[in-house]
């Protein structure tokens, strides 16, 4: 397995692979890898000749009061995990490699970024789309693998790839959970013992909502109320948003047409966690 830090070097490797007509699966990450990431790597390994993982904590997708400086990093552990799961190449550029000068060009995806995390984290998806556009141009992958836990990000990136004619297939992979139901996240590392226990309220509230939908509840305001009521019973939980949107357009819906995304963002102490599920008629 190679670990490469420069765009020049990674392009030389990619060119060789492309000359040999090899397919490339790409997993973009910010590092501090967990089982959610390794599920993406395994899928990429199954479907491609070569697998690349990028590890880059992207500064332009963090707001001024967010956790860029404290975001967990552990390249040694990440490298070991990547090697274990058959990754061929880790691309781990410095910030100065990705952004050597002040950046004037940004990628925005309208409409899909107007609510959910896009509303609560202004500029976040512009940063995500800009860095992924750079990575797609540098790495030229056949397929890219993203987790469904970040459902809005997945929808936004799919639309960006469609609109800008990137010759890349975007593959969404299911949420991976701890045994007790908490969605795997690098930010779970911030939680102390009590907060970790309290964080289970996210999945519990969504489970109640899903159960109501499966039992025939069609009033989406009632579904929201079920989630809010459950979350409010947890003292350490502070709701950022509870939203029900069309799973493709991410626009708010008043009734279920075909497929809905039920998404929540909740602060447990100072840590912001997200979770979701999709429900189809």
Curated annotation (Swiss-Prot):
Additional remarks: The reaction proceeds by a bi uni uni bi ping pong mechanism.
Residues given in the record as beta-alanine binding sites: 61
The protein's annotated pathway: Cofactor biosynthesis; (R)-pantothenate biosynthesis; (R)-pantothenate from (R)-pantoate and beta-alanine: step 1/1
Transmembrane segments: none
Catalytic EC class: ligase
Record text on subunit structure and interactions: Homodimer.
Localisation per UniProt entry: Cytoplasm
Catalytic residues, chain numbering: 37 (proton donor)
GO MF term set: ATP binding; pantoate-beta-alanine ligase activity
Cellular component aspect of the GO annotation: cytosol
Protein name: Pantothenate synthetase
